[in-house]
Amino acid sequence: MNVDPTRPRLSRRHMLALAGVAGVGAPLGLMQAVRALPLFAPVGAADALAEVPICRASDTVDEVKGAPRHVRFAYNGTGICTAAVPVALHRGYFARHNLDVEFLQLAGSTDQMLQALAADKADAGSSMLLNWLKPLEQGIDVKLTTGLHGGCTRLFAAKESGPRTVTDLKGKTIGVSSISGPPRNFFAILLSDAGLDPQTDVQWREFPADILLAALQRGEIDAIADSDPNAWLTERRANGAIVEIASNLSGDYADLSCCTLGVRSSLWASDPNAVRALTHAIRDATHHVAEQPDDAAEVFSKYTPKVAAADLAAMLRSHTHSHHPAGEALRREVLKIATDLKRASIIRPNTDLVKLANRVVIDVT
């Protein structure tokens, strides 16, 4: 652990209002200004956060010289698996790499985040790789720099009478909170691996995340596919009545990334040093999450006040936050996941996956 003798600077500006910006389409107009510190924690709490010593995954020097580089980071503060992002802010990793980072809150889906990056309304964002590969295949001009972690997507069934394996799901109905979301895409891969057709051998039904457990109990669905924190909390609410039968740490995916860091291509072209600095800051923060999950949970709890920090820490421990591949290692993972998505009929059959991986993954280390 390297201890910074000075307290890390927090960003001077924390959120940017995007609503009403000229040239933004309707989905981008849903962006709202949210101040990271005043909204989620008093100034005193932020000062206390800054006191925690900093551990680093890399010993690289700051890539950005002179005045801090302003970076607009699209972040909605809902996914515990991207806890490294607020940790990078509140524990000073952005400041150590000479970055002045603002959080932009998106009111909608990952697609809006990608549109924001491609349209130069944001500089960077993080989300599930399974959600990004289809838009990237379709031509969204965003580059991937590093994975953030593995794990966080789970499949549950009733303990007493539900299916016990993915193969048992043939002819069953799986509940999801989004038909096009990462849980549906990932478990479509596992179904395909098990010799089932995810389009015809199972049915998918969409429910609000907080209704999935009730739908299972009413017999409307036979299994639940969801991501943390909702998946974890659903299992807790069930009080032992459901069991996890698979996750995105199953099989080959035990050593693969779940979430990734993406940047707009024009930023990589115009300021590669800023992209390197951002990537190294996030990788340092993921190391912090892996080594200090209780502290990372305390940071993230300011963004999800309805969930106890102890529960958030338990979720983080169940993920693989020490796994953050970059460069060729990330390119191999993208190729593997894209290959699986093609087999599950999510990626087009004629897409050249090697070209796709080479196009979207950049080397920053």
Where are these regions (language model features)?
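N-terminal secretory signal peptides
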Residues: 1-14, 18-27
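Short, glycine-/small- and polar/acidic-enriched structural segments
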Residues: 37-197, 205-206, 222-228, 244-245, ...
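Conserved C-terminal helix/tail region of periplasmic/extracytoplasmic solute-binding proteins
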Residues: 43-49, 339-365
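Periplasmic-binding protein-like
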Residues: 75, 148-157, 240-268, 318-319, ...
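Structured segments of extracytoplasmic/periplasmic soluble domains
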Residues: 88-91, 97, 116, 120, ...
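Short, solvent-exposed loop/beta-turn-alpha elements that line the ligand-binding surface or hinge
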Residues: 96, 248-254, 321-330
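Pocket-lining segment of extracytoplasmic ligand-binding domains
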Residues: 130-131, 210-302
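Secondary-structure end/capping motifs
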Residues: 269-346
